């Protein structure tokens, strides 16, 4: 019985006060300000997060809010809020940034380790996004079925508040959180079933990302519990399972059954080959199981969302596919990953007889989704819908060196991210689009022609795009010749273990 309580029982010592430090502890503002400046987000060029709020302005807004009327969600005028005035959207966004920093403090590994007097083990290799793909290469070739899951986001802001209730001790911070979500829900209508998670997080990425991660954490804790204890829960109905009050009674009954040596009656469905991978709002559940059991997991996930999280069950949320002969490719983290068979003919000779042996080996393919990537380039105004490069008119005011440097950084980031592709032709097409778009942008700025500009510039622009790749290959293969390095660049895979954020052009969904 204690084993199940470890998974499901709420630890009251983990609850925290969030609104009190926001109002009365001044060091919170400095901490939030420094955290915002030190947080980096991968944009098109790998830029840093732009912190628009200062600690002094946040403190003034908090004081103004505290001295005015009590917090009220219902406002008489949609244009003027009784707390913030006409700039309610801007002020609420600034305060919510600091509120997000306060909420993140108890969950900071560095802070918890400091308070406990422990050191954080440095393992940067396990933090890289690219570390997932060697895992795919090692595991997918031995698996049969995969569940392609798009985790639903809550359709009502109250679901996010209820998820956070287990970690919050003071009710006033929950009211403040409801106020922020009410502002976003009324002004932008973000929390709707039609929008993706990227749109859901666009207005205030820091606070909503924390709330969404809390929502996903609750979902995954139940999912992992079911995976670990599925042998004990085969006869448990779903509605009884998610209600913790009735769950313990069911478990006690099952313990009595096991005590009477009736284990043979209850078949074991625990799968040791089940693998789970998630990034943002998409997850993959792969297994060597039969399609019948995988279909059961599919309907179980749908029921979990409907009954426990009150999320809408849209068609296509969970798709069951068979990993066979490259007919299905997993669209995950900007790559199309699939399993294909490689045939290898071996001639064997025994005495006077010779015969051929056909050996088939499964191999994981990782390719570039060129159609989606060109769509991202089109949306960013680097090319048209047909993939023809166009000039970047919004960058015409930059200097030549700054404009070229921007294109080189974008090309370098994409080249590094897709270095693990098994087919590089699509990647070279993307680099060609960026290179020619850079030339056309310079031509438009100087009011010249492409031929005249290239004739005057020569091969200097081309060297800017290739210099970074030659430098990386020289570090990886110092003794190899230049020809062999370029051959490996075209044929081999290179996974970088320092890529922590997905590029905006890669994240096209």
UniProtKB/Swiss-Prot annotation:
One of its GO terms (molecular function) is RNA binding. The keyword Plastid applies. One of its GO terms (cellular component) is chloroplast. Its main location: plastid. GO terms for biological process: mRNA processing; RNA splicing; tRNA processing. It is found in: Plastid, Chloroplast. Belongs to the intron maturase 2 family. MatK subfamily. Usually encoded in the trnK tRNA gene intron. Probably assists in splicing its own and other chloroplast group II introns. This is Maturase K. It comes from Citrus sinensis (Sweet orange). The lineage of its organism: Eukaryota, Viridiplantae, Streptophyta, Embryophyta, Tracheophyta. The gene is matK.
